[in-house]
Amino acid sequence: MSVALADYFADVHSSDVFDYGFGSISDFLKVKPVVPYDWVIANPPFRLAEDFIDRSLKIARHGVAMLVRTVFIESVGRYERLFKTRAPAIFAQFTERVPMVKGRIDRKASTATGYA
């Protein structure tokens, strides 16, 4: 995602808790930002997505965009904790299924999972 985002943003910072050979190695939920961020754009682990959104809303000056499974928005508990007071401004559902293949693009891959 970072390479594509660099086509549109002057400064892109990338990190992950694992070394994928790109960006820094750090835990987004624990590290203190060294600079203020205009946007936080992420594909968080599903089980941590709510925490990522909470943290992102605190440190982003302009906006937050998350790539999550569509079912993320379907939880009553998540609605009460997250969306009731901070509803998404835009919910952009992918019209086709987007297979997530670790570290590569596989045009023959398929999935039953929807993403937004």
Question: Can you annotate each of these PLM segments?
Answer:
Residues 1-116:
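Class I S-adenosyl-L-methionine-dependent methyltransferase catalytic core
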